[in-house]
Structures are given as structure tokens and as C-alpha cells.
Amino acid sequence: MENYELQIRKTRTVPGTRGNIFDRNGEVIAYNELAYSVTIEDIIPTDTKTEDKNKILNDTLDSVLSIVEENGDSVIDNFGIILDSSGSYQFAETNETSRLRFVADVHGKSFIDDLTEKEKNKTAEQIVHYLCKRYGLDYSEHDAAYILKMVNMRYAMGLNSYQQWLTTVLASDVSDATAAAIMENQDSLQGVDISEDSLRRYPDGQYFASIIG
């Protein structure tokens, strides 16, 4: 039987680094600063059972969350659900169309009109329950804040599920301590890595950021 070599081309976009900008007196008005991000690539074999994959991912993300927070940093917080002052789940969007667009995305629907009435009327808490079931997260064993952080990270990873080689940012602009701790524990953090980013800084504030570049 002939041997075949499987060749896979993986394409990633690498942002360019902009140079420093000086004013006419030689003072720096825009510069780059090295920053670290915690990223993850889904390297779990595609034939892994869903239950097993969920456990691997959840254990990994739980460890990442602990490391990040122990060093004073935070994981991503760009999900469509937030916690209100009483600790209850609420939709981040108050605009009804935007809220329904988010609900449609959660349910994998291309159009809002594809949602059933039951799906349209789901509360934020029901959406979280729905995703916990999908991700194999035990809703009853953890507080709302922990669950929301885990759902945040799992949902972000899910957005790249059809392009597994794309990395997902779990925490951005983290401290040197966080970056070092992640690297020290990398053997037990499947697919997790530290990426170097270039953040644009403006000594005189953001007032002219859109003009300076």
C-alpha cells in the first residue's frame, strides 16, 4: 500500500510593527511596548470523544485561569453576557436586535429569523446553562463569576472551531510573572503558549492617537 504524505497549509496573519514617531523637537509622541498574551491552540485530535475533549479543555482553562489571576491579571471578558451588581447574569447588549444577533450566534443560526420563539426568549442565565451543557461545565459546583470566565474562554475558542490551527487569546497584556508561570507549566497546559504583542503607547494620552497612528 502506498504511503501518502498529508500536507496541510496553515495560514496565520502576523501584524506588522509600527515605528516610533517623534515631534519636531525630537520628543517621542508614539512608541511600541512589548506585551505578552496567553493563547491557546486546539491541538486535541478531531476524533476525540466530546466528553473527553471537554474535560481536557476545561482542566487546561481552569489552570490558566488560576495562574492568570494569581499573578494579578484577568482573562478575556468580551462575551455577550455579564454579571450585574447583584451577581446575576445579564445580556451585555440592551439593544434588542444586537441581543438577538448574539443569541443567534450562540445557537449557530445565520439569521435572527432562524431562531425559534423559545430561543429568542431565553434569559441570559438560560444561555449560560445551555453553553455549560455544551462545554461540559458543572454549573452547580462553581459560582457565577467562575462559570462566566470559563464560558468566555470556551466560547472564544469555539469561534475558531473550524480552523483549529488559529490561536485564541485567553488573556492579553499580562505581566512578566504570568508569562513566566505559563511557560513553566507549559508541559501540563495543552496547546497553551505565550505570544509577544506590540502595544501602541502615547505619552501624552490617546487624544491624538487616531491622527498620529
Q: At which residue positions do the language-model features occur?
A:
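Membrane-proximal periplasmic segments of bacterial cell-envelope enzymes
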Residues: 1-213
